[in-house]
A protein has these predicted regions:
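Mature catalytic domains of secreted/periplasmic carbohydrate-active enzymes
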Residues: 1-229
Length: 229
């Protein structure tokens, strides 16, 4: 695809009119048919849809998340519904994912429950892999990719990116993944594309020749497919 769209829709999103719904109710009310029709009218070939950001929630009944902290999922499987509605137009679905952290105003205990501990990150990494494996196997080829944000949070934990990648590609070995390094060089070779935060100049970049393959020919992101958001 030449281009896609990214949508930031989370537990903190507000409706245009009326009061904010409880997350599960907002997921239940999401009109996927109208959404897919709108995306199709833009000509986009794929979308990146935000799942968790800031607060850790996920719009589907994922047992591994419920086991960590109940009340962070939904009974409706919005991801599957998006795959179906977008797929009717030939549009692929990718998901944005943030490992989550406590709410900055009212800490809710997510980081403690998920095992985030810089001195012993094994529980945190194990939980992340369990969540990714369940989600990946649930959606298979319907889930085309992952955009993992905020690499500055988990890179200092020295995770095994090969292990994370295997979990990320569960159910679909062709699923593309990236770990957002912000403005820093890439964190690992075990990824498929460059997230592109702050890379608005990609069209004129010396390492991305015009009419080329779209893959960096040199520099800190050499061999990664270029992407910007």
């Amino acid at each position: 695809s030449k281009y896609g769209l990214q949508f930031h829709w989370t537990s903190e999103s507000q409706p245009r009119y009326g009061k904010q719904k409880v997350y599960a109710d907002a997921v239940r009310a999401f009109d996927v048919q109208s959404f897919a029709q709108m995306v199709n009218q833009t000509g986009a070939g794929y979308i990146i849809f935000t799942t968790s950001h800031a607060e850790h929630y996920f719009p589907a009944p994922i047992k591994s998340i419920d086991a960590i902290m109940p009340g962070r999922t939904s009974d409706r499987d919005l991801v599957q519904d998006l795959i179906g509605a977008l797929g009717a137009y030939g549009i692929r679905l990718m998901l944005y994912y943030h490992v989550g952290h406590d709410h900055w105003v009212e800490p809710d205990g997510w980081w403690t429950r998920t095992g985030f501990a810089p001195d012993n990150p094994n529980v945190f990494i194990s939980n992340w892999c369990a969540i990714m494996t369940e989600i990946g196997e649930r959606y298979g080829e319907g889930l085309a990719g992952w955009f993992y944000d905020d690499g500055c949070v988990y890179y200092p934990l020295n995770p095994d990116f090969r292990q994370l990648g295997q979990a990320a590609k569960a159910g679909n070995s062709s699923r593309v993944i990236c770990y957002n390094p912000w403005i820093w060089p890439r964190f690992t070779d075990f990824q498929d594309y460059f997230c592109g935060e702050g890379y608005g100049f990609l069209n004129n970049h010396e390492w991305l020749p015009k009419n080329g393959s779209g893959i960096f020919t040199d520099g800190p992101h050499k061999y990664l497919r270029a992407h910007t958001n």
